[in-house]
Amino acid sequence: MHPALGHPRALSSAPASFPPPPAAARLQPLFLRGGSSRGRRGSGDSSTSTSTSRGGCGGRRGGGGGSPSSSTGAEREDDDESISISKPLVPAAAALPGPPAQGGVPVSATAPAAASSTSTPTSSCSMTAADFGAGAAAGTVGGPGSRSAVGAGGTGTGGAASCCSCCCCCCGRPTRSGRRGRRRGCSPSPGCRWGYQALSVVLLLAQGGLLDLYLIAVTDLYWCSWIATDLVVVVGWAIFFAKNSRGRRGGPANSMHNHHQLHHHSAPPLHLSAAASAGAGAKARGGRGGSGGSGAGPGTTGAAGEFAFAYLAWLIYSIAFTPKVVLILGTSILDLIELRAPFGTTGFRLTMALSVPLLYSLVRAISEAGAPPGSAGPLLLQPQQHRAAGCFLGTCLDLLDSFTLVELMLDGRVPLPAHLRYLLIAVYFLTLASPVLWLYELNTATAAPSWGQTSGPGSCSRLLRLLGGCLVDVPLLALRSLLVVSYQQPLSIFMLKNLFFLGCRGLEALEGCWDRGSWVSPSRARSSYGAPPSAPPPPPPPPPQGGSQRGHLENEGGPHGYVNTLAVASQN
């Protein structure tokens, strides 16, 4: 497309009248005219003579000064001829005329700004179908709120372009500027994604290094094997984090797309009926990668496999941590630690207690890496992450219960026989390894735990929860009862905790057996971890009236088809 001839002209600083549209433009339909609806400023404001008269396409010419009033008639004829020759199929601003935005800036001057993220800046006034599709989806089709939001930052149905222009209205973070001044969408910061993973590795090294220090400095037993064990655990966790992020490499992109569609979706095309418009809006809100079943939300798809390999990582840690502590508690090394170590048994207690923040860092590292932007926090978690938080709190209470039993050995207040001492150590490490069960349960779950099904992930979840209660709470309650009866120990509040957890898990198992063969009602589905069933799909839109059925059938998807449909209808 050749630029118009004539001397370069700068922006005018004095009010000037605009030339009438040429005869070739008057013969075209209204939505194909370029520059028929050009805004004007008031008598006190200054106006532009180049960008506004070209329909807002940004045809600014650099060069020396010169006002539009000093241009000759030949130059204007050349300009008009150039406009009529290079007239695009759908102009940038005159596709759907509307009222000007606040401040006197016309819609034609602001429409290309909304579509600047998809179109490359050129010196011509043409606009492709993709550019119009982005601009129509962002501002024009969205309604009058979108047109006013572009110029004045207002809010409306289609105010997506203005919402993400400088910052995200959902997560509140400023967007990063891309190439040529474009704005990128919402994106999670790398620090939030990798912070808890780095903290997990630091806690692994700290706990393993302190235990190695106790074993090597006090007894000098197999120091190479202890250090090699720590290195194997750290490398295994690093491989777990790498495989977890690689397995969900496409997850953040789908989550970002669904997050953008959820908060910045535009209205469906104008030529669709009401039922089809509702279906298009539901599709925009539901996301592209969601499953069609119940509970398919924007964040559910990305969270389906986020706990993969987590149970293996914790199992490796439990296997490596157990022999070190058993060797210290079961031999005379504990007495040597009290005599030679800097902090004595207090430092050993703190080293054992690092398992709880390590488990917390593991759960948060998985949740932060898979969560969509703006969903961090205890009140905005996905169903699986709510389940993980509840299981973590239960495991913390179980570890605290078993650790108080181990402290009876450390203090020496109660003369326990050898078999009871080993039983206490076995119960402690059984409690330490219990997160493997619920991490595996979260891994085998699909989009969300389905409690109302007779087989599949729901039955597996009930079985694993009941098994975890029997393996942890029953031995702890039996040991507490034995200490109360045989060794005159006082009653502990942890006995009530064990009874409460056993009762809750038993009720869950009975509820699953009672509801066998029946689906969950919608009211119970809303109160449980699952999501309510989705509404039935809307009926297909009726065929359009008139002679443009062929254009609707061929070009029915998206703004591109909408533009081509308008062109076919105008030709008919």
Swiss-Prot record:
Composition skew (Pro residues), residue ranges: 533-545
Pfam families: CECR6_TMEM121
Low complexity biased stretches: 44-54, 88-123
Location of the region described as Disordered in the Swiss-Prot/TrEMBL record: 1-123, 525-572
Alphabetized UniProt keyword annotations: Phosphoprotein
Record carries keyword Methyltransferase: no
Keyword 4Fe-4S attributed: no
Modified residues (Phosphoserine): 162, 165, 548
Biased composition (Gly residues): 55-67
Recorded family membership: Belongs to the TMEM121 family.
PANTHER family the UniProt entry points to: TRANSMEMBRANE PROTEIN 121B
Protein name: Transmembrane protein 121B
